[in-house]
């Protein structure tokens, strides 16, 4: 049971999402949600973020690579985690009320809805629009605006939940690192000894024993794998 109830029957057409996002953000920024009868639960269910809203057309680009790179620049790998997946993963982990819990790229705070103690939640997010929504929905949480690469946690964590930005290249040309791998490294710095990392990543992450050998060895040094499983192919379908 979360702080807000998920509307399982709600379906928002893609063409309406951007307009709804903008209206919600305006009401939150201007403290007018109550004036128009909009509840936090309404916002929890309706605000969807940037994923899929790039507005680009494949035919305007010379090749598919240029198209996907332009999409990345706009979306920054952002696709909010579906509420049912967050609820399921939190139920699997069963965090205790005293646990210090992080999400290092929290979006609008989808995992937070199902955590036991709002004031024990910490994290950072680079999208200011999402930050404003998350801070509105979870006012007792310790939520910062900023880049994960510059984030300095104030406490060691018991659990890190995460759905890192997909397929972004961070680091340098000489030492590139995927956004997913960077998230793992940052989580390792944040967690206490014996802490738990609960992560959503593409199936391609660390899937090649040859080309990913170094990263696989580093992950094996930092973490002990407890369990992994695949989500349905349409789990992030808009």
At which residue positions do the language-model features occur?
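Conserved short hydrophobic patches within well-ordered secondary structure
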Residues: 24, 28, 69-71, 80, ...
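Switch/connector loops and helix/strand junctions flanking conserved nucleotide-binding motifs
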Residues: 167-170, 207-209, 237-238
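Short, intrinsically disordered, charge-balanced linker/junction segments flanking boundaries
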Residues: 163, 233-238
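Conserved Class I SAM-dependent methyltransferase catalytic core
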Residues: 128, 176-235
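Long recognition/docking surfaces used for binding and targeting
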Residues: 2-70
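Short hydrophobic/aromatic-rich motifs at helix boundaries and adjacent loops
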Residues: 57-62, 103-105, 186-189
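Conserved S-adenosyl-L-methionine
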Residues: 73-171, 181-182, 202
């Amino acid at each position: 049971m979360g702080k807000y109830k998920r509307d399982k029957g709600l379906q928002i057409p893609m063409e309406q999402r951007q307009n709804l996002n903008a209206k919600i953000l305006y009401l939150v920024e201007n403290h007018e949600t109550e004036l128009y009868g909009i509840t936090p639960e309404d916002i929890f269910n309706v605000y969807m973020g940037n994923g899929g809203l790039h507005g680009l057309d494949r035919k305007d680009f010379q090749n598919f690579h240029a198209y996907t790179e332009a999409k990345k620049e706009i979306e920054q790998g952002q696709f909010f985690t579906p509420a049912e997946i967050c609820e399921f993963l939190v139920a699997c982990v069963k965090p205790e009320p005293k646990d210090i819990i992080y999400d290092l790229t929290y979006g609008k705070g989808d995992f937070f809805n199902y955590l036991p103690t709002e004031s024990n939640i910490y994290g950072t997010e680079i999208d200011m629009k999402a930050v404003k929504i998350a801070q509105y929905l979870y006012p007792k949480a310790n939520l910062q605006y900023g880049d994960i690469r510059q984030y300095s946690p104030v406490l060691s964590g018991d659990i890190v939940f995460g759905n890192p930005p997909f397929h972004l290249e961070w680091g340098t040309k000489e030492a590139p690192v995927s956004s997913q791998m960077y998230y793992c490294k940052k989580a390792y710095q944040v967690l206490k000894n014996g802490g738990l990392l609960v992560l959503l990543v593409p199936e391609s992450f660390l899937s090649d024993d040859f080309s990913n050998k170094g990263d696989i060895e580093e992950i094996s040094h930092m973490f002990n794998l407890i369990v992994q499983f695949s989500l349905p192919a349409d789990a992030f379908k808009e």
